[in-house]
Regions:
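C-terminal target-recognition/interaction regions appended to catalytic cores
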Residues: 1-186
Length: 186
């Protein structure tokens, strides 16, 4: 497969070769609507959605309840009453978005008043939960001496782990193909 022309520009780089789902397919799923916030509520994954894309899947996969960073979250000083009124899945605001357990997460980009609320707990997300939404392995933790602000800034500045892994694998394949083509005199 030829990836560059005579002028050495990329013609057909296989960006999507490691993608598991297309954005179009994800957007076409029948994701649940907003539901009233009920602290401690339990619900089953709805039929017809990719569970592996959901917030709850990543919370469970990373065992966020038992993670070293499980109890590292900002405690609400004011605004708890307002926080309790925000429905699960209301992510249309600039700040204080209550993510839905059975939807994919909005972009994890903390800072500039971007705040994600836990789907079924009366609090903001923990460091462990935010890292799980970036698809980081559950063994990953941040140094305990890091401030909460720095933890969330670090998480928000990161590229999702699985995305980075896919890009790296695609680049590796591309380089290996280019080397093989070079060695074969193509």
């Amino acid at each position: 497969q030829e990836f560059k022309g005579d002028d050495q520009t990329l013609l057909q780089f296989p960006w999507e070769s490691k993608m598991k789902c297309s954005l179009e397919d994800i957007r076409n799923e029948q994701w649940p609507d907003m539901t009233p916030f009920v602290e401690g509520s339990v619900s089953e994954c709805p039929d017809g959605i990719e569970k592996e894309l959901t917030v709850q899947y990543w919370f469970e996969k990373n065992d966020v309840e038992n993670h070293p960073d499980a109890n590292r979250y900002f405690k609400p000083k004011a605004g708890l009453r307002k926080m309790l009124e925000i429905p699960e899945g209301d992510t249309n605001k600039k700040s204080y978005k209550r993510i839905h357990r059975w939807r994919y997460s909005p972009t994890v980009a903390y800072g500039n008043n971007e705040v994600h609320l836990h789907p079924y707990k009366a609090r903001r997300l923990s460091v462990a939960e935010a890292m799980s939404l970036q698809s980081l392995p559950k063994e990953f933790s941040l140094p305990p001496e890091m401030t909460l602000t720095d933890c969330f800034k670090t998480i928000g500045n990161g590229v999702p782990f699985l995305m980075a892994k896919g890009v790296a694998a695609t680049l590796k394949d591309y380089i290996n193909t280019a080397v093989l083509n070079e060695e074969a005199g193509k």
